[in-house]
Amino acid sequence: MPDIPVSQPVNPGCDAPVGVFDSGVGGLSVLNEIRQTLPNESLLYLADCGHIPYGEKTPEFIIERCLIIADFFHGQGAKALVVACNTATAAGVAHIRQRYPDWPIVGMEPAVKPAAEATRSGVVGVLATTGTLQSARFAALLDRFASDVSVVTQPCPGLVELIETGDLVSPQIRQLLQRYVEPLLAARCDTIILGCTHYPFLKPLLREMLPASVTLIDTGAAVARQLQRLLSRSGLLASGPARDTLYWSSDIPDNFGKILPFLSQMSGNVRSFRL
């Protein structure tokens, strides 16, 4: 499949697609939520697998990738953009909004507010990438919503890379996840934030490891609802039916395509993204 060039911007209408991107497959968890909430919407998905993991990259690099991908989706005529990556949101969403002030844009951020409201022990755990945990955006969330609770943060190097291979159950990922969960349980966390869009795919495994009293919180459903609000406010809700989702990958497209069925996705034609 040849590289897909950036086209000239198209005037988006109600039936134009929504662009969704992540550093890899993690944003597919958000894509699932969007499909459930907005079944009439046609979707474009770009996995920047050639530059994963974002969580270990510099903010400057992530900003550059965010703007390149935003330009691409804008050129494809997307009527809205979902930054389905916590790290990319923390580093780059403000820059995208500055470039496209009239474009409906939804970002991700760890669910600090609902977690602080849900905890009974007063101790909240956060599983996230290093980039998210070190961001000014995350620090601001803690200052704003978590002043009355204790927050235990746990960076999770290696998890994203394993999930990218479709590995959700192997002994290797079990051992790694157990290592990251144990400090949170030792600190009496009764509410754990999944602060990376890859991590909802590990919910079944986490349920095996955690007491039933521990609540897991992610923001995929909230992002879908926010997208619904923005599209409704702009008069851009689609009447349907939704067209097949189009996928792009900045790595070898066939590799991404083989993983889709493992992550509850219909197999699809994956195109090459080389920018």
Curated annotation (Swiss-Prot):
GO MF terms held by the record: glutamate racemase activity
Record-annotated active site: 85 (proton donor/acceptor), 196 (proton donor/acceptor)
Function: Provides the (R)-glutamate required for cell wall biosynthesis.
EC number(s) on file: 5.1.1.3
GO biological process, one term: regulation of cell shape
Pathway entry: Cell wall biogenesis; peptidoglycan biosynthesis
Lineage: Bacteria, Pseudomonadati, Pseudomonadota, Gammaproteobacteria, Pseudomonadales
Protein species of origin: Pseudomonas syringae pv. tomato (strain ATCC BAA-871 / DC3000)
Family listed: Belongs to the aspartate/glutamate racemases family.
Residues annotated for substrate binding in this entry: 22-23, 54-55, 86-87, 197-198
Reaction equations catalysed: L-glutamate = D-glutamate
Keywords, ordered alphabetically: Cell shape, Cell wall biogenesis/degradation, Isomerase, Peptidoglycan synthesis
Top-level EC class as recorded in UniProt: isomerase
Alphabetical list of InterPro entries matching this protein: Asp/Glu/hydantoin_racemase, Asp/Glu_race, Asp/Glu_racemase_AS_1, Asp/Glu_racemase_AS_2, Glu_race
Protein's recorded name: Glutamate racemase
A Pfam family per the record: Asp_Glu_race
